[in-house]
């Protein structure tokens, strides 16, 4: 199985990404499945050089995940009479390497155990009672250190730390009911981190809201995170569809830490988000680092809150070639005020003005087993002051264009 995407921005940011996975079934003769997934993405700034040298500005992410799935619940043990619907147990080990150009290199690795239940054809439950991740900041640059010396929240989010978490996810999908022309898909997920460890400390006499408690000599994260997403596919006619999507998320850190881990925070933009803007190029809120080094500001374009809305009209052109026009909107925000990122906190009175907006068009070559997609995003509105009056405030038309080549539909 292979997924591929390539993104190009008019500001010379170019980046491919790919996911390659291999699966071996019936590993032990009892229906077990062993899987390996390798993913990677790379982005470089084609029109800029570092400090006058020939080195290109580049960032990359690499990830390796191995899974072993048993087609039953291993613990506790249920009889077939107690559980007469599909269920499975999955053990997972993973490692993710994140390199941010000129700033830092972060390694996150860990493992988890989860249960999957499907009591009906349309409902799916996923329970992860145990997940432990360790974030290791491997390398920082002088430029990064100079930023974190004044931006304590960013420094805290990237510190070496454990993330002991548990998760529950519910998914509803009525697409298996083939008699319906219109399809609904929605998912809700909640993650809690650090509560059990904090409870153990509380039993030992430590105050619940006291910070800097540790696990094996390193701090551990404590937060609650929730996301919800809904998609609706409405059939207009022969191979014509109006597809809508809404997504919202929030993460709140408390107790042992007031800043959530960097890789748990929200970001926006890219081939499956607001296609006129590249990943981590907007937000939080109206925040904008107005300096010569703004192209590197993606390191702190993360937030505690996220809202995103997409509307796409899909239509046939010729044979397996289809077209699409779309409208994308959204942003991320901070829950707490951060003086290092002015304008980043959510203010309900300016919510609509804070939403970035983009439109565009695309082509899809649908071969049933694979969809090859090319989208052109066109920026209409940026949430921060660009110096241009009016709702359409893109300084130059070409600055608000994004080009995306990908495998699969965006949603």
Enumerate the predicted regions with their spans.
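Glycine-centered small-residue hotspots that permit tight backbone geometry or close packing
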Residues: 110, 129, 270, 356-362
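Gram-negative/organellar outer-membrane beta-barrel architecture
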Residues: 1-187, 275-276, 287, 371, ...
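Strand-loop-strand
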Residues: 8, 24-26, 71, 339-367, ...
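C-terminal outer-membrane beta-barrel translocator/porin domains of Gram-negative envelope proteins
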Residues: 2-14, 19, 23, 126-315, ...
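Conserved C-terminal beta-signal and adjacent last beta-strands/turns
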Residues: 307-315, 329, 356-367, 406-407
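Flexible, small/polar- and glycine-enriched "cap/hinge" segments at structural transition points
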Residues: 328-330, 335, 360, 364, ...
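A cross-taxa feature marking solvent-exposed loop/turn segments within ectodomains of secreted
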Residues: 13, 29-31, 237-239, 318-320, ...
């Amino acid at each position: 199985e292979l997924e591929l995407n390539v993104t190009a921005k008019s500001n010379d940011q170019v980046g491919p990404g790919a996911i390659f996975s291999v699966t071996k079934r019936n590993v032990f003769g009892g229906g077990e499945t062993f899987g390996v997934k390798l993913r990677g993405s790379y982005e470089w700034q084609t029109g800029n050089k570092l400090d006058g040298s020939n080195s290109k500005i580049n960032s990359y992410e690499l990830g390796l995940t191995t899974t072993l799935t048993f087609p039953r619940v291993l613990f506790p043990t249920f009889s077939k009479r107690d559980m007469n619907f599909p269920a499975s147990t999955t053990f997972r080990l993973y490692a993710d390497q994140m390199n941010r150009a000129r700033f830092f290199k972060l390694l996150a690795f860990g493992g988890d155990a989860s249960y999957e239940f499907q009591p009906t054809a349309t409902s799916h439950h996923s329970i992860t009672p145990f997940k432990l991740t360790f974030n290791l900041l491997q390398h920082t640059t002088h430029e990064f250190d100079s930023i974190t010396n004044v931006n304590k929240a960013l420094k805290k989010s990237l510190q070496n730390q454990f993330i002991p978490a548990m998760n529950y996810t519910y998914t509803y999908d009525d697409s298996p009911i083939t008699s319906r022309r219109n399809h609904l898909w929605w998912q809700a997920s909640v993650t809690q981190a650090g509560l059990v460890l904090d409870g153990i400390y509380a039993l030992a006499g430590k105050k619940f809201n006291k910070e800097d408690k540790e696990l094996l000599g390193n701090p551990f994260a404590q937060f609650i995170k929730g996301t919800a997403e809904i998609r609706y596919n409405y059939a207009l006619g022969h191979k014509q569809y109006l597809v809508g999507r809404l997504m919202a998320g929030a993460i709140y850190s408390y107790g042992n830490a007031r800043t959530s881990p960097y890789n748990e925070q929200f970001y926006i933009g890219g081939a499956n988000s607001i296609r006129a803007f590249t990943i981590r190029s907007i937000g939080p809120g109206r925040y904008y680092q107005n300096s010569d080094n703004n192209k590197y500001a993606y390191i702190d374009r993360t937030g505690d809150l996220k809202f995103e809305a997409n509307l796409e009209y899909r239509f046939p052109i010729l044979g397996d070639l289809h077209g699409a026009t779309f409208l994308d909107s959204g942003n991320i925000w901070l829950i707490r005020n951060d003086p290092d990122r002015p304008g980043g906190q959510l203010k309900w009175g300016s919510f609509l003005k804070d939403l970035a907006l983009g439109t565009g068009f695309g082509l899809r070559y649908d071969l049933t087993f694979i969809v090859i997609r090319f989208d052109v995003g066109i920026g209409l509105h940026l949430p921060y002051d660009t110096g241009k009056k009016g709702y359409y405030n893109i300084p130059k038309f070409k600055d608000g264009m994004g080009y995306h080549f990908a495998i699969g539909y965006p949603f």
